[in-house]
């Protein structure tokens, strides 16, 4: 699954266009490397997202094309 779609489906970022912009700005790292929105995300990957001065680090646990709001938190875990 593409990185921008995973971020939207998991609700780490609300909109896919915002996820694209964050990737273009270099604020998202996958396994420690700057990532484009088109990078394929796999189970076990570590994603770091920089929101201003705050950094969120998560590990991908599951990948689904769609999910309910209550189940979105099961797609990742905070590190």
Predicted region positions:
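A basic, amphipathic helix-loop patch mediating RNA/tRNA/ribosome contacts
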Residues: 1-41
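C-terminal structural segments of small proteins and small subunits
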Residues: 53-79
């Amino acid at each position: 699954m593409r990185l921008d779609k995973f971020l939207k489906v998991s609700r780490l970022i609300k909109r896919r266009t915002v996820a694209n912009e964050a990737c273009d700005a270099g604020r998202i790292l996958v396994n420690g490397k700057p990532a484009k929105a088109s990078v394929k995300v796999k189970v076990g990957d570590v994603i770091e997202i920089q929101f201003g001065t705050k950094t969120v680090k998560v590990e991908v646990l599951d990948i689904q094309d769609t999910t309910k709001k209550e189940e979105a938190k099961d797609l990742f875990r905070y590190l």
